[in-house]
Structures are given as structure tokens and as C-alpha cells.
Amino acid sequence: GRFSETSREGFLLAQDISSYSLTIVAHEAKKIMPNGGSIVATTYLGGEFAVQNYNVMGVAKASLEANVKYLAYDLGPDNIRVNAISAGPNRTLSAKGVGGFNTILKEIEERAPLRRNVDQEEVGKTAAYLLSDFSSGVTGENIHVDSGFHAIK
């Protein structure tokens, strides 16, 4: 359907699941990170640009990306870093709910600088980097793992 037809219930549910959940995780994680640590969230290009059929999830991802920045600022003095990974589309359970998903995959293969889609392992390796000391100076970032598609959008 159209974004303008989003129900209040649907809007709030998307915000709760996709954005506010990070706030709760960060609050609880801080309790077990007395010496600092790292928190990583996943997002999607639809939080930065309007993506056909992504609708309320795009608004929720935009909220999540702002949440990452505010949590990075808030938890930085505790040596807790907060970052996001904006992953290219992967075949997941949630992807099944996105209309035209195969068309999106094809467009990335044709237009992204690397001319291919990314896989879950590439996203996982980026998360490992963000969770490791190799990224000790990185916080409040949204790293794109999408074969460069975000750069040409």
C-alpha cells in the first residue's frame, strides 16, 4: 500500500521493533560493559532514501540511524561505541515482505560499482570489525555494505 495509508498501530510497531529496541539493548548492555564495548545495529538504504515498497520501514530505519548517533554521543563517555551497518538486500525472512525484492537484487547487480549483491558473510565480517578493537575510534557511523550501491543512488 501507500505510505500515507500507514496505520498508527503499524507505524508505532515499526518504530518499536526497528528503533526503540536499540535504546533498550543499549541500556541493558551498558550494565554488562563496565570497561566499554561496542553495539552494532543493522539498517538499510531505505532509511536514507525513499525506496519503493519499503514505506513505514524506511521511516523506522531513519529513526534507527538517528538513534545510533544519539546513543554514540550518550554512551561515548562510557567507552561504548554504537554503529550501524547499512546492508544491501539479503534473502532473509523480513525480505520476503518487501514487494519487488528480486527486482531490487537485479538492479544492484546491474548498477552497483561492484556489479553484484553482497552476502551475509560480508555483512558479518563488517560487524566483526565494528565489534573489535580494530574500530576503536569509530562510533556513530553507518557503514554501507552494499557493493557501493548507496554511492550511485
What role is predicted for each listed range?
Residues 77, 87-112, 152-153:
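A glycine/serine/threonine-rich, flexible loop-to-helix segment
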Residues 112-123, 134:
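A conserved structural motif in NAD(P)-dependent oxidoreductases
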Residues 2, 14, 38-64, 68-77, ...:
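Catalytic loop of short-chain dehydrogenase/reductase
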Residues 26-27, 69:
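A short, exposed helix-loop element centered on a Lys and neighboring polar residues
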